[in-house]
Amino acid sequence: MRPMYETQADRNNEQRVADLLAEKGYSLDKLPMSFGLDVAITDDFEEKIVAFAEIKARTFEMNKYPTAMINLHKVIRAHDISACTGLPSYFIVLYRDALVRINFASEFEVKMGGRSDRGDPADRDVCAYYPISGFTVVSQF
């Protein structure tokens, strides 16, 4: 079984995203790990789920790299959820200078990727690389 790497900093970043989306009229509801994505997004006015999302935070600016990477299993899960519910699923990234989103259904490139700083061989896997040019800026700071 893989270790859990979610930290308090990760939870703080998710709260920051929730606060930024609340300014736009949306609430985030944390989903159980078994669901495969982080949150359901609810329209506060209509009080219904309008999308699902996986949230990542990066410690650099949005345009530092030409793509944003995420594990392919998250993309597959997002596609399954969207196919079942008819609702979009988004990859939301909190950068140092912006909060951005892209629909998981957007085009991406498949390559090996991941990290090596934790010494966990399972951190390297098949990943989806979404072009930064395809992201929509939700908030700029």
Can you say where each PLM-predicted feature lies in the sequence?
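Mg2+/Mn2+-dependent nuclease catalytic core
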Residues: 58-77, 81
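Short coil/turn segments at beta-strand junctions that form active-site/ligand-binding loops
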Residues: 26, 47-49, 87-88
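Nucleic-acid nuclease catalytic cores
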Residues: 79-107
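Conserved catalytic cores of phosphodiester-cleaving nucleases, focusing on short active-site segments
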Residues: 39-41, 45-61
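Intrinsically disordered, low-complexity terminal regions enriched in charged/polar residues
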Residues: 100-141
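Short acidic/glycine-enriched loop/turn segments that link adjacent beta-strands
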Residues: 33-37, 97-99
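Acidic-basic catalytic patches of nuclease active cores, encompassing PD-(D/E)XK
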Residues: 1-33
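A short local loop/turn or secondary-structure capping micro-motif enriched for an aromatic residue
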Residues: 38, 60-63, 109-112
